[in-house]
């Protein structure tokens, strides 16, 4: 019995040595892996430390963006933050109505991921002005639109939303607050009077805002265009109303939509898709100023 046990000893020793050898090889493999991976991790950590702990001097371009960023925020009014935007210089102002029930609902709409829409300013019915995007930031308010030859209105415009459901008049307090914003934007960025327009102007087939209740005669104060009632005359037979609409800026590919948008703004009490003699006289008067 003793001799049989001794016969097993060499096999047991060999088995034990093979296990130790395997562990050693495994340990060496792990050690080799660590030697290859650790330097990469260290480099990554060092790079992160350099990025976070070093404050480099701003380049001219970065300094300009930083300066514009400061200039585009108006500290004396309430600030909220929208989440959908890009950066650009404004040269147009697009006026909208919210078609929602409250200021807070509109703000919330501009702060949730799935809506993919935003505006620079929202003005409440009682005249509270809320800035949601820096003036130099590209908002997402115009959507699919066209004005003249411009097909990306978001890139050159500031969007202003008026808290209004589209079926009611715009309160005086709201319009006066709007005037303050428009006057500031015009002074700060040199925006031409003709470049204050409505959402329906640039997207006539999709939008009707601001509604017919909006007082576009604010052109008297330098924002937008308006005709001179004292100078209305019958348009000559050679007058081409389609060309006139196009020259003003309307997208005439959908002519009926363009006519309705024009009449909703300048005629108001008749928004049919046909131009009457009176409508043409208004259009002709506007056309002469372009």
Annotate each predicted stretch with a short phrase:
Residues 31-191:
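Active-site-adjacent loop/helix surface patches within enzyme catalytic domains
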Residues 24-36, 171-290:
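Basic/polar, cationic surfaces and motifs that engage anionic cell-wall
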Residues 19-21:
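C-terminal motif of bacterial Sec signal peptides marking the signal peptidase cleavage site
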Residues 2-9:
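Bacterial N-terminal signal peptides that target proteins for export
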Residues 11-17:
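Hydrophobic helical h-region of N-terminal Sec-dependent signal peptides
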């Amino acid at each position: 019995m003793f001799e049989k046990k001794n016969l097993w000893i060499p096999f047991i020793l060999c088995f034990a040595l093979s296990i130790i050898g395997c562990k050693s090889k495994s340990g060496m493999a792990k050690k080799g892996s660590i030697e290859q991976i650790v330097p990469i991790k260290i480099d990554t950590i060092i790079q992160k430390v350099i990025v976070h702990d070093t404050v480099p001097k701003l380049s001219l371009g970065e300094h300009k963006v930083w300066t514009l960023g400061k200039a585009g925020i108006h500290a004396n009014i309430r600030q909220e933050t929208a989440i959908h935007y890009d950066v650009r210089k404004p040269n147009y102002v697009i006026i909208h109505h919210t078609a929602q029930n409250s200021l807070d609902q509109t703000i919330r709409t501009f702060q949730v991921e799935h809506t993919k829409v935003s505006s620079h300013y929202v003005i409440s019915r009682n005249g509270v002005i809320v800035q949601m995007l820096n003036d130099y930031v590209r908002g997402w308010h115009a959507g699919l639109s066209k004005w003249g030859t411009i097909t990306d209105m978001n890139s050159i415009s500031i969007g202003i939303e008026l808290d209004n459901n589209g079926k009611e008049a715009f309160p005086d307090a709201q319009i006066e607050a709007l005037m303050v914003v428009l006057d500031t934007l015009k002074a700060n960025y040199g925006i031409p009077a003709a470049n204050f327009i409505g959402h329906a102007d640039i997207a006539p087939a999709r939008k009707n805002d601001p509604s017919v209740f909006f007082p576009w005669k604010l052109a008297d104060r330098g924002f937008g265009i308006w005709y001179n009632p004292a100078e209305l005359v019958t348009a000559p037979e050679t007058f081409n109303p389609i060309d006139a609409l196009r020259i003003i800026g309307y997208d005439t590919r959908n002519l009926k939509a363009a006519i309705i948008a024009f009449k909703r703004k300048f005629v108001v009490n008749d928004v049919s898709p046909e131009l009457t003699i009176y409508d043409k006289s208004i259009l002709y008067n506007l056309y002469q100023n372009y």
